[in-house]
Amino acid sequence: MILNIGLIDYGMGNLHSVEQSFKRLNQSLKIISGPNDLSNCDALILPGVGSFDPAMKNLQQTNLIPELKKWVLNNKPLLGICLGLQLLFESSDEGKSKGLGLLKGTIKHLPKSEKQLIPHMGWAELNQDKECPLFKSNSSPQWMYFVHSYSAIPSDKNDIASSVNFGDEKITAVVWKKKLAACQFHPEKSGRSGELLLSNWLAWLKKETKDLY
């Protein structure tokens, strides 16, 4: 089955790395720069590198915000990556702009810790908090690559699919709600573990898409 997956380009994402990760999985991506590019897409990817306010400003300029809200409201698959996860929430301590509000909750600065440096940069082992199509039940613990200073605080803790230890606390690593998924880490920079996660998402997506036809 051939999937049509859109990669949103709003000037704040590491598009090349994401494209290359999916290319290794024999999956091409279609660049989405505006509403007219969304036709025939089965799923969307919202990447992100940088700060919250400039990201929301750039996204606003693409005229994609109403379309993204309709996309998720219609229960279509979307995958957020790093800053892309944070934009899904209502607000962020990093800026004054409103987020997309597709998930209830906010983005907070990482808690100060004598055991951890900020920004949180490097490899960390995931804790699986609930069953999620991004992870296989019999898989070994996954290590992913993080680069961030802020983390999501979902209003509904059931939205958290995976967390990671940070000092004496746990912070959000993966959210999953209906067909909306997002990860704080960079799967495209996480070697075999990241590749496996993206492969699991594609397998789930193919099943979901097949069931529609």
From Swiss-Prot:
Places the protein is found: Cytoplasm
Span of domain Glutamine amidotransferase type-1:
4-211
State the source organism's domain of life.
Bacteria
| Active-site residue list | 82, 186, 188
Primary location group: cytoplasm
InterPro entries documented for this protein: Class_I_gatase-like (IPR029062), GATASE (IPR017926), Imidazole-glycPsynth_HisH (IPR010139)
Q: What does this protein do?
A: IGPS catalyzes the conversion of PRFAR and glutamine to IGP, AICAR and glutamate. The HisH subunit catalyzes the hydrolysis of glutamine to glutamate and ammonia as part of the synthesis of IGP and AICAR. The resulting ammonia molecule is channeled to the active site of HisF.
Tell me, how does this one assemble?
A: Heterodimer of HisH and HisF.
- Name the UniProt record assigns to this protein: Imidazole glycerol phosphate synthase subunit HisH
Q: Which organism is it from?
A: Prochlorococcus marinus (strain SARG / CCMP1375 / SS120)
Q: What is the lineage of its organism?
A: Bacteria, Bacillati, Cyanobacteriota, Cyanophyceae, Synechococcales
